Amino acid sequence: MRTKRVFHAVDSHTEGMPTRVITGGVGVIPGSTMAERREHFLAEMDHVRTLLMYEPRGHSAMSGAILQPPTRPDADYGVLYIEVSGCLPMCGHGTIGVATVLVETGMVEVVEPVTTIRLDTPAGLVVAEVRVEDGAATAVTITNVPSFSAGLDRTVKVPGIGEVTYDLAYGGNFYAILPIESVGLPFDRAHKQQILDAGLAIMDAINEQDEPVHPLDAGIRGCHHVQFTAPGSDARHSRHAMAIHPGWFDRSPCGTGTSARMAQLHARGELPLDTDFVNESFIGTRFVGRLVEETEVTDLPAVVPTITGRAWVTGTAQYFLDPRDPFPEGFLL
């Protein structure tokens, strides 16, 4: 057997959404911060992402995380979040998966009943508290980066749909949030392709007409997620379908999307601090969110969210790159 590269991985899923945690084979990515490492990775190493996320090693909804040494003294590990759509500043379900893998594999000192793990991410420091019972990770609560509303009742002209009203919020990534009935579609997986097509059209229109940019980091820009809320959703329990570029649905309730949703509801005066919020995915799995603090991002009112969810280890693997492989960077259909 011949191979140009060997990548070591622990696979997991968080409430139905995969996280392939890369524990070796990448090396230390250049950069003095995880944000700089992300920029270097995107510019010089994106073939590693596509090799590991795209077919034939991955699939059209694959997600993962690359472990790195931290760039700051208060963190245990650095994390770079990868998926078919790109390299994210932050990923909530991925963080829950990473924290579970670190505990289940003994890559951190395990303390019962709670093991605290501090992760250095491109979006900032993220703290994960892992509930441990008999040595097993049973749930993870993450304290996410400050999240904020970037605009309520915004409008965008979408080809094939017309004028669409949406709220824009940030929870580690930017999210357009709107009721699914506002685009004339039912909340029904039988209509998933129509829902996905509408989501992609909306995010393309937003990015063409009014691309969002994080006020503290110009490298965090663009809307690549559209959260369609189901009829009957409110500030205590919300169901949604999360359409994601370049064309797939989140299987989990989406951690950064849950953070953005809570920031939106707080901005509307509907979700106070210290109140549980249940966010349910398109397949019926759930995260429990809570806003624990008000803060600011530049001059924007912001909130600090926590998200609680579960993940399970599904296997370990080594991924190779045979020098004769006709798809050295993978492919997508």
Swiss-Prot record:
Enzyme Commission designation: 5.1.1.8
Organism: Streptosporangium roseum (strain ATCC 12428 / DSM 43021 / JCM 3005 / KCTC 9067 / NCIMB 10171 / NRRL 2505 / NI 9100)
EC class (word): isomerase
Single Gene Ontology MF annotation: 4-hydroxyproline epimerase activity
Catalyzed reactions per annotation: trans-4-hydroxy-L-proline = cis-4-hydroxy-D-proline
Similarity remark: Belongs to the proline racemase family.
Protein name as it appears in the record: 4-hydroxyproline 2-epimerase
Record key words, sorted: Isomerase
InterPro entries found in the cross-reference section: Pro_racemase_fam
Gene3D superfamilies, alphabetized: Diaminopimelate Epimerase, Chain A, domain 1
Signal peptide range in chain numbering: none
